[in-house]
Amino acid sequence: MCQSLPPMKKISLFCMLGLLLGVSCSKEKVKPPAMTDDTVAVFGDDAFGAFCLRTYDRNGDGVLTVGEIKNVVSLDFDDKDIRSLDGIEYFTGLQSLYCNQSAGGNLVRLDVSRNAELRTLCCAGNKLEELVVDGLRNLSRVDCAANNLEKLDLQNLPVLTFLLCRNNRLCNLDFSETPGLKSIDCANNGISALDVRPCGDITMIWCEGNAGMRISLDWRQAPGIFGDDDVVLEVAGDENLVFADAAVAGGVVQRGVLRDDLHAAVLLHMVLSLQRGGV
């Protein structure tokens, strides 16, 4: 017959359960606290903090609050020696962020996922290994060229139209949640396959420097495609699609261009495969 535990053992057991539950809960992702106008902005980089304080401390008290910077719509840190933009989330009304570095910047990580109003992001020429932009439903232009990115999450970016990510270390790009994308420059990466069929308005793709890349697209959606000599292009279109080379086109169709007005797909020195009914 089972006997009940002595009172002290019961207390110890409940304490252990509480500790276990506490550990379990601590692993869950905690949402950041809501910001008010009185929230003090804290920056992870002295140069970044000094710039913001010097520029936006309106009452001169040496403290920067969200109320003082919430209406800032554009920030330009091009060619400034800033190593971290931690604290950028305090700029809740930010629409444009420029932190390009022509001489090679120092940013290794950039998270703008809490800047919900952001429309334009230019962060080329840094040392970025991580760029967090997913979920920005107003973001339309991203230039993150010449960094060290091995992955780029493009989830939930419904109005993104322009993506420049050449000269990184990317192996894959998923465009399933970027239906408005019109221009892609992903040259000089390590991408082996590119599926742009979810992008109904695509007009330009620059993809040179990705050896053996296979592109999947609907030719009727792509009036201009610039590729490389070792690219395989898979085209899904109607059965009357005509293939021509530059000589036949008389120079109107240029090398590496898919021209909708001529109903012709031209990729000189490339393998061109047409799979009826889709790819």
What is each model feature region?
Residues L17, C25-G105, A116, R137, ...:
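N-terminal capping/linker segments that flank leucine-rich repeat
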Residues C171, S176-M213:
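Ankyrin-repeat and related helical/solenoid repeat scaffolds used for protein-protein interactions
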Residues L85-I88, L107-V112, L131, L152-L154, ...:
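Canonical leucine-rich repeat
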Residues S4-L5, G22-S24, E150, D229, ...:
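Short, low-complexity, intrinsically disordered N-terminal modules
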